Design a protein with these regions (language model features):
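N-terminal membrane topogenesis motif
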Residues: 1-36, 92, 96, 233-252, ...
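Membrane-proximal transmembrane or re-entrant/amphipathic helices at the cytosolic face
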Residues: 2-5, 553-622
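Interhelical loop/hinge segments that connect adjacent transmembrane helices in multipass membrane
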Residues: 2-15, 194-202, 217-256, 283-290, ...
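Signature of the first transmembrane helix
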Residues: 2-4, 17-76, 106, 113, ...
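Short runs within selected transmembrane alpha-helices of multi-pass transporters and secretion channels
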Residues: 33, 41, 75-76, 138-158, ...
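Interfacial/gating helices of multi-pass transporter permease domains
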Residues: 45-65, 194-203, 240-248, 271-368, ...
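Helix-loop junctions and terminal segments of transmembrane helices
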Residues: 72-87, 364, 375-392
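Interfacial segments at transmembrane-helix termini and the short loops linking adjacent helices
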Residues: 121-139, 341, 350, 355, ...
Length: 622
């Protein structure tokens, strides 16, 4: 198994196991970025609707992989090499490392830009959403900026200056928030279709990377002015430096980007299987009858089948081939044949329905991804604190930190997952009034179960990496991602499941990853944490909390529901739903906090990982 040496840390009189210095700055910046992202995605979904949401996410998923690469392995590699050279007083080595890294990122970024801009239609086709092409093109320039940002952030972090990285990330997120939402809103008001509004929202991302890059360049030159004069050290050969960068970056990048890669594959697969089921198995139409008008699809299928040659099966493979031929003919400026016209019309209709369905699923994913924001501070702190304990040969201390990280994660993940499971539909009605809550609500409830697994998995990955086993999380994610793809390929195509089966892949994927991570930790980590005490109390408190939330919402909805003027069953208004949801969450939080304190589910060691943890421990009398 691949290992790296845990870096040593000087205590300097500071207490271990706390958020301090650079880790605290990075954690705070990451948390702010996640919060800004929440305030961005929720109104965006309501502005561009389900189809625009699908187009946005299909384009953004491609960018997310590149974003993960830029904020994971590459900056870490540059910062490590720069930090080592800087500690040795080798300023020429620092400059050579940065120059080579910047050159590498510019080359890769330019190649990615060319592919995304000129092959946007092909990439959108691979995602089974041709309307995502404008968004992919709008996002293409950001790839070049992302590469430059990676080099500059790594250089800054290598000098132990984390502030520029955090500030640039916040600038990027704020531009995305204000410019992206403004453009999307303006385009919708101008009568532009959802895919163009989605492209406008994505333009905010691109502008954000440009502004963040300008800030990082200014910070870089200001830092250079404060550096001492010339250095006489001889830098290493360029080839050796490049090999060092790749040696460090590749394992971390693969581990961090695996989730994004699986997401891209899975998004394409889910939409493709939805379209296939709609065409080949009309029995699945019953799943969506309440919010999808199938008359245009039925008409398009009938017209297309009449144009098929005798003996040709009416399958998705045949339709896709004919639609591709039609699009190629249009690109070449040639006239379409009648079968090509029929195939293109049917393919467009199928794609429109799948965009609506996937857009609702994406809105559920938006909420499902929010709990991971709270994991950022924990995952960032685990690696340096565990590594520092190991460098001091304090295995008992490292084990305590790992156990505390798992316990804090469980204390956060279990109630959030249970809350989403119990209140999935009401939360969708509150946050996304334009979405179909009868679709997105059950999807969110099912995804709530996966929330627990993914949060715990992220912290387990950090623990394994802190102990030096950087390749194990990659192997685990490959297995989990393969299971997710296999599951969704088969489940989504079932007429009785359809897109409602998509969350099953998340549950099985991250459930398997968590199980394997816990088994690996028990095998390769000395003094492994005891899992039953870590998970039992948070689970018990969360289960009782979930029952309380369910009861409060149910009682409130009965009291606040009223019959419509024309008669009929009682209906809960939007305001009434908001009151019930917020009331249920408030009661649930109070119940959970009381149970956590009563069960002694958190210890002083756990609180020591948090800012002001000592004061909180004294308040709870721990």
């Amino acid at each position: 198994m691949a290992r790296y040496d845990a870096p040593s840390r000087r205590s300097g009189g500071q207490k271990q196991n706390t958020f301090f210095g650079g880790a605290a700055i990075l954690a705070a910046g990451a948390m702010v970025v996640k919060l800004i992202g929440m305030f961005y995605k929720i109104p965006l979904n309501n502005i561009i609707g389900a189809q625009g949401n699908a187009d946005f996410n299909n384009a953004y998923n491609i960018y997310a992989v590149l974003l993960t690469i830029s904020t994971a392995g590459l900056p870490v590699a540059v910062s490590k090499l720069v930090s080592e050279a800087n500690a040795q007083g080798r300023r020429n080595q620092v400059r050579r490392t940065f120059q080579l890294a910047l050159g590498m990122f510019l080359i890769l970024g330019t190649l990615s830009f060319l592919v995304m801009y000129f092959k946007a239609d092909a990439l959108a086709g691979l995602m089974n959403d041709t309307k995502a092409a404008p968004g992919i093109r709008a996002l293409a320039p950001a790839v070049v900026c992302v590469g430059c940002l990676a080099a500059l952030r790594g250089y800054s972090q290598g000098h132990l200056n984390m502030t520029p990285t955090s500030v640039s990330q916040i600038i990027e997120a704020l531009c995305k928030l204000f410019i992206g939402l403004s453009l999307a809103y303006a385009l919708i008001k101008m009568g532009q279709p959802p895919e163009m509004a989605a492209a406008g929202a994505i333009t905010g991302v691109t502008v954000g990377t440009v502004v963040a890059l300008v800030y990082m360049v200014i910070s870089f030159f200001l830092a250079r002015l404060r550096e001492p004069g010339r250095s006489r050290d001889v830098p290493d050969a360029s080839g050796d430096i490049i090999r060092d960068i790749l040696r460090i970056a590749i394992p971390i990048t693969l581990s961090s980007s695996m989730v994004g890669i699986v997401t891209v594959i899975d998004s394409s697969l889910v939409q493709g299987q939805v379209q296939k089921a709609l065409l080949e198995n009309p029995a699945c139409w019953e799943l969506y009858q309440s919010f999808v008008d199938f008359a245009p699809l039925e008409s398009a299928i009938s017209a297309w089948k009449e144009l098929l040659t005798e003996g040709t099966a009416a399958t998705m493979a045949v339709l896709s081939a004919q639609a591709e031929a039609a699009q190629a003919a249009l690109a070449a400026g040639t006239a379409l044949t009648a079968p090509q016209e029929g195939a293109l019309a049917l393919h467009t209709t199928l794609e429109s329905i799948s965009r609506t369905l996937y857009g609702n699923y994406s809105s559920a994913l938006t909420i499902y991804n929010l709990p991971t924001a709270l994991m950022t501070a924990i995952t960032i702190s685990v690696i340096p604190t565990v590594s520092g304990a190991l460098a001091r040969r304090d295995r008992r201390g490292a084990s305590r930190v790992a156990a505390s990280a798992l316990r804090i994660t469980a204390l956060l993940a279990f109630p959030m997952g249970v809350g989403l499971f119990v209140l999935g539909t009401p939360i969708v009605q509150l946050l996304f009034p334009k979405m179909e809550s009868s679709l997105a609500g059950p999807l969110l409830s099912t995804l709530g179960l996966a929330t627990v697994f993914v949060c715990l998995m992220l912290v387990c990955n950090s623990i394994l990496q802190a102990y030096g086993f950087v390749n194990l999380p990659i192997l685990v994610m490959v297995l989990g991602g393969g299971l997710k793809i296999f599951t969704n390929y088969n489940v989504v195509a079932m007429p009785q499941m359809g897109i409602y089966g998509a969350p099953a892949g998340n549950i099985l994927c991250f459930g398997l990853c968590l199980l394997l991570d816990l088994l690996l930790i028990s095998r390769v980590v000395p003094r492994r944490p005891r899992y039953l005490p870590v998970f039992l109390k948070p689970f018990t408190a969360s289960a009782i909390m979930g029952a309380a939330a369910w009861a409060v919402y149910g009682l409130g909805s009965k009291l606040l529901s009223s019959a419509p003027e024309g008669g009929g069953p009682a209906v809960l208004s939007t305001t009434g739903n908001a009151i019930c949801v917020l009331g249920a969450i408030g009661v649930a939080m109070a119940v959970y906090l009381v149970l956590v304190a009563a069960l002694r589910a958190i210890s002083r060691d756990d609180l020591a990982l948090m800012p002001k943890g000592d004061k909180l421990a004294r308040l709870l009398r721990l």
